[in-house]
Amino acid sequence: MQVSVETTQGLGRRVTITVAADSIEKAVKSELVKAAKNVRIDGFRKGHVPMNIVEQRYGASVRQDVLGDLMQRNFVDAIIKEKINPAGAPNYVPGEYKQGEDFTYSVEFEVYPEVELKDLESIEVEKPVVEVNDADVDTMLETLRKQQATWKETDAAATAEDRATLDFTGSIDGEEFEGGKATDFVLAMGQGRMIPGFEEGVIGHKAGEEFTIDVNFPEDYHAENLKGKSAKFAIVLKKVEVRELPELTEEFIKRFGVADGSLAGLRAEVRKNMERELKGAVRNRVKTQAIDGLVSANNIDVPTALVDGEIDVLRRQAAQRFGGNEKQAAELPRELFEEQAKRRVVVGLLLGEVISQHELKADEDRVKALIEEMASAYEDPQEVIEFYSKNKELMNNMRNVALEEQAVETLLAKAKVTEKPTTFSELMNQTTAA
């Protein structure tokens, strides 16, 4: 077997392999002998068909199978010998085959990039320093009450805390535009769902009033024909409702799993959940900065095959979120996922090199702690822990999470880490925005 390797472009490689004719004929003869044992041809007993007849009848197909097998096996031998690490499936390009002659073919593929980590000391990370205080718990209790609130119709003017039911018709230069009209539209005020100026124009009006408001569509508005345009909305305000918050009664508190129904018990449960969320938010904030710094400091090429694989994964995930199927997933535009897919590949390669260089292995104590932390959010944590322990795939996924955390900690040991005091609400708002 003769082997030559050439670089086509970037990470692209072409391996050209020549297989000696005698190796091919030897393999073909061996396969024909095996086939002859089971061949049934009229006039001959099973296993006693002359080899020349077996070759005449089956030689072409056996030869084709042998060539396919030799191409794969010799390629594997070649990349092992040449110490090449292919990324993605190879493309076999067979040459012309003539019986009794050497056979030459080529294989085209991409390789993994050679990653040399650098400038890890230049990575800068701000670690949020924050605690859950009583005021944070009070705010969360108020949020819980709002989530359980009921609505009561009022004759008073609408405020930023109310809910309004209205009809509206939008127009630009006196002409109605597509998507600018609705009937019995329910608007929860203060959530920023509408374009700037719309809610403000409703506030102060009472049910039964008809009025017009002037607004400007933002320059970055999603509809091209409306970007930056001035518009008028004719509004009929049909109903205004005020939010009625439930009292923190024993019955209300028990809805949240606090058995004794006490306010102290609810506050303790809320604080525990907030601290768990806070721990995760701090961890993710630090991790994101560390990985961003790693990516910025290490510009590497990525194999197209790996990016394509990630795009397929992201397509399927997107389709599943919206109830789509495999066919619909494949039809989603590549451009929607390409940037995210490329970043995932880059991050995977760089963290993989961190793990390899430092010979990291998943810490089983950390794996156990991660499962326990995740399980604590459920009604029966022990049941969740046992479910994970019996599921090999879930355990491997959690080991990967632990290993990634260990890789990030390795980065942080070299990075410039400074502590930044902040508040619970600021951190959680940043997390939501991200």
Curated annotation (Swiss-Prot):
Protein name: Trigger factor
GO biological process annotation, one example: protein transport
Domain of life, per lineage: Bacteria
InterPro entries listed in its UniProt record: PPIase_dom_sf (IPR046357), PPIase_FKBP_dom (IPR001179), Trig_fac (IPR005215), Trigger_fac_C (IPR008880), Trigger_fac_C_sf (IPR037041), Trigger_fac_ribosome-bd_bac (IPR008881), Trigger_fac_ribosome-bd_sf (IPR036611), Trigger_fact/SurA_dom_sf (IPR027304)
GO terms of molecular function: peptidyl-prolyl cis-trans isomerase activity; protein folding chaperone; ribosome binding
Function: Involved in protein export. Acts as a chaperone by maintaining the newly synthesized protein in an open conformation. Functions as a peptidyl-prolyl cis-trans isomerase.
Domain PPIase FKBP-type: 161-246
Gene Ontology CC entries for this record: cytoplasm
Recorded domain comment: Consists of 3 domains; the N-terminus binds the ribosome, the middle domain has PPIase activity, while the C-terminus has intrinsic chaperone activity on its own.
Entries under Pfam families matching the protein: FKBP_C, Trigger_C, Trigger_N
Family: Belongs to the FKBP-type PPIase family. Tig subfamily.
Signal peptide boundaries: none
Reactions it catalyzes: [protein]-peptidylproline (omega=180) = [protein]-peptidylproline (omega=0)
Subcellular location: Cytoplasm
Source lineage: Bacteria, Pseudomonadati, Pseudomonadota, Gammaproteobacteria, Enterobacterales
Class in the EC hierarchy, top level: isomerase
Record keywords: Cell cycle, Cell division, Chaperone, Cytoplasm, Isomerase, Rotamase
E.C. no: 5.2.1.8
